[in-house]
């Protein structure tokens, strides 16, 4: 099956997170028939597929682990799509469908490249593996995170991770990610006293008391960033207060915010800074809950990155820009432990949008690029 047909077959499966919807069994069959050792790892409602070929050691060569995901975000209002989101449609030189860019096109390209690689080089140096989950777009608890202990216990911990996430900006290969900022979620609850607006006092209203604090949080500066990372930033994502009635003052205000932090501001220091700020503004009785969903990692450097850059130059005729922008990926489960993580994939301009799409020419080129990345790292011609 070529990469276009395989992408279409994957997109046609309604795999809204965490439902794999049969994507992984199809890929597992292809990889098994090509000589890969395949294992399935299900945790809760999440499916994870691991396929591996060869052996890695300091004598034989490194272990390359490709990472992907078969789950997609919901399509949104399906009547706003120009064609049904789970009926992959070619139009104007592009393939349209939910998940075609994030990241079923890359899933297909990784599988095609891996099968082609081991067919051409059955006795290749090192080990090449693929780990795919159906829990990347969701909580990411029963996905890659849950498989990590198995990798460590069975000697399958990688030397380098290649992630097929859509990293390109305007053209295929113009950008790859060599690290990521962390992601921290917080929920702040400020107590007040619910009452009739005609009788409530300003000091009873948590929305009034929170005003200066909201402004201070929005203006908070943590660091200046550096040549590899943007500054750490906080964004308030939700504010909830009141009953919906215009004559009832709220008894509680709930504020949700997200922080993207670089390595210069670790989570513990960031938490202390924010908690000190809340104390200083004294908004009344409050409680704050934290959840760290990703630690920052990178930027990576060295021979593996050099090999990937050389592969891009050879196949696409240009050296990619190296950056650490964007959101989080499943590289978060390897990068903070010292594994170089390199993310390379198609253009990300339409991911999570209505009429998500990718250029057919880019899809056809991806397996060649991915093959060249492996060949360059393993020293195979």
What would you call each of these model-derived segments?
Residues 39, 65, 129-131, 287:
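A structural signal for isolated positions on well-ordered beta-strands in alpha/beta enzyme cores
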């Amino acid at each position: 099956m070529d990469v276009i047909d395989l992408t279409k077959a994957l997109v046609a499966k309604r795999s809204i997170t965490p439902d794999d919807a049969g994507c992984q069994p199809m890929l597992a069959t292809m990889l098994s028939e090509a000589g890969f050792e395949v294992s399935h790892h299900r945790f809760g409602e999440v499916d994870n597929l691991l396929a591996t070929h060869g052996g890695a050691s300091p004598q034989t060569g490194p272990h390359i682990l490709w990472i992907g995901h078969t789950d997609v975000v919901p399509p949104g209002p399906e009547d706003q799509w120009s064609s049904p989101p789970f009926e992959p449609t070619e139009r104007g030189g592009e393939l349209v469908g939910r998940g075609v860019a994030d990241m079923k096109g890359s899933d297909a390209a990784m599988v095609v490249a891996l099968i082609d690689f081991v067919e051409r080089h059955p006795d290749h140096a090192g080990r090449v593996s693929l780990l795919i989950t159906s829990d990347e777009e969701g909580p990411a608890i029963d996905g890659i995170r849950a498989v990590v202990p198995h990798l460590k216990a069975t000697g399958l911990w990688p030397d380098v991770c290649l992630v097929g996430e859509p990293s390109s900006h305007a053209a295929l290969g113009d950008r790859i990610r060599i690290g990521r900022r962390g992601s921290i979620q917080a929920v702040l609850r400020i107590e007040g006293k619910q009452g009739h607006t005609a009788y409530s006092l300003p000091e009873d209203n948590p929305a009034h008391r929170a005003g200066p604090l909201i402004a201070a949080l929005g203006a908070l500066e943590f660091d200046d960033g550096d040549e590899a990372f943007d500054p750490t930033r906080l964004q308030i994502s939700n504010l909830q207060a009141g009953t919906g009635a215009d004559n009832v003052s709220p008894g509680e205000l709930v504020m949700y915010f997200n922080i993207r932090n670089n390595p210069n501001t670790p989570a513990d220091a960031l938490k202390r800074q924010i908690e000190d700020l809340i104390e200083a503004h004294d908004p009344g009785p409050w409680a704050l809950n934290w959840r760290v969903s990703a630690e920052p990692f990178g930027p990576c450097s060295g021979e593996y990155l050099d090999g990937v850059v050389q592969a891009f130059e050879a196949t696409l005729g240009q050296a990619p820009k190296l950056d650490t922008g964007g959101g989080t990926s499943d590289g978060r489960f390897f990068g903070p432990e010292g594994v170089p993580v390199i993310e390379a994939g198609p253009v990300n301009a339409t991911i999570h949008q209505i009429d998500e799409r990718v250029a057919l020419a880019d899809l056809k080129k991806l397996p060649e690029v991915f093959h060249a990345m492996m060949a360059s790292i393993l020293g195979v011609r």
